[in-house]
Amino acid sequence: MTTFHAVLRIDHQSAEILQFDAEHLESQRIKAHTHHTARHASGVRSEHEFYAAVCDALAGIPEVLVTGSKTGLADFRHYAEKHRPALAPHIAGYEPVDHPTAPQLVALARKFFLRHDRMAGTPTPS
């Protein structure tokens, strides 16, 4: 399925990517694997592997709205900007949210992208 928009809900343990167009919705979940070692007791390595998997899953999606808690957003944004700068132009925005359902996320994203596309002068594909 070719989609133009996606919304990512991320926290430190999991991520959900909802790709959508006017008629279709496709969901993908990514979970963090926690494997603390004596050498990497802080879990930074695990977090980086998790964020890398999320960035890989976002590859090829033209516009993504990233949602989540403020700390989850800040940490993912820092990782993406530092380690995956090619992804930055595809991230349309960051929106803090609590724990919305998938339909609530899609509704939020549709509203966001309608505003975003109009401001950018980009026609939204139908």
Model-inferred region functions:
Residues M1-S126:
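Terminal alpha-helical anchor/extension segments at protein ends
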